[in-house]
Amino acid sequence: MENKEVCLVCQDFSSGYHYGIPSCNGCKTFFRRTVMKKQKFVCQFDQNCPVDKSIRCACRFCRFEKCLKVGMDKTSLQASRDPIGYTKRNKKTLRHPMNELSGDESNSCTPDRQLSPLRSFENSLNFLAVRERSANELRMSSYLPKRSLKQALCSKPLINDPIFMSKHATVSPRHTFEKLRFITQDDYHYWHERDWFVLTEYAKTFKVFKNMPYHDKTELVCHAAIVIPVLNQVYNSPDYGLDTVVFPDGTYYDRTHEPTRPAGLNRKKYQVLDLVLKPFREMEINFNEFAAFKAITFLNPDADISLESKHAINEERVLITKQLYAYMVQKDGLEKAIYRFGRLILMGTSMSKMACESKEAVWIADFFENIGFTSFAKELIFGDH
């Protein structure tokens, strides 16, 4: 494919020359908005995140750096011209370059209709990745409202509100660090509250969740209150080895015994390291795989919900599971995909057991007043009753 047909930032189809290089509408808009709003981003990893059409939204720092690296010119940007909008694409029948989602699609020019199954799971996983990126932006912000579980679940989804996200979803100065420090009880409280808030907002982005009765919404979110925060904390942790989970503010925990914490919560910490962190690192789970696995974990029909909601959730869950498997086969080849997919899905069983044991530990800790939960946390852990 000639360069003029490909966005130099993400390798998607180019819609024309923008700011000096061929680029797609998405990267053009992202570059313009970043420059015009003078936005500053922070990479959560080593400033070397992949940027292609399957994962271009995952790290805005690395995406903007790539825009500059491939030649996008800030000086050619004029506020009164080149409005953000849709430019009709040149729909030629073209080969796609090898990339993370589409892989080696074809050895020759292939009509769009023949690529529709691949396009289908590409689009679905892209949507999950965008949702996950937005959820993490909210997690990294300083926004944390005080509200009841009912208020949280009945309000509009903030992640789907672009005006809110542009105003509030910026990285809090608190969520950066220069050196690590061992986590305290207050730090645990802080990050659990943040992750539970983001969980309620994440849940509301699912159409199947929106259509459920309130009782079922509550039960599903409460069922996910242990495992989803664990997934967030582990996947977004910078790599300091297989025995350390690091939070965005530089606080961390490892295998060090914490005598002031209940024994059950110490045990949960070791389970997180062994059952989640270690497999994630060994399998080298990428962003798309994580976004899909998190959705599969959240949409759990084993929650105490109505039969109708169980069917609806299971249908959505099976669809995402099939798309994840197809993606992994496309990316890894059949043999490796079967191993990685099987190992990833089996993690769900171990995590469910961990969640049950953790809730028992929390019940005991609350009974003996070992932990001071907020009313919102109590509703989420013990149910909205």
Swiss-Prot record:
Q: Where are the zinc fingers (NR C4-type)?
A: 7-27, 43-62
Q: Where is the NR LBD domain?
A: 145-384
Enumerate the subcellular locations listed in this protein's record, separating them with semicolons: Nucleus
Q: Name one GO cellular component term.
A: chromatin
Q: What are the protein's GO molecular function terms? A: nuclear receptor activity; RNA polymerase II cis-regulatory region sequence-specific DNA binding; zinc ion binding
Ranges where the record places region Disordered: 81-110
Q: Which InterPro entries match?
A: HNF4-like_DBD, NHR-like_dom_sf, Nucl_hrmn_rcpt_lig-bd, Nuclear_hormone_rcpt_NR2, Znf_hrmn_rcpt, Znf_NHR/GATA
According to UniProt, the name of this protein is Nuclear hormone receptor family member nhr-68
Q: Which gene encodes it?
A: nhr-68
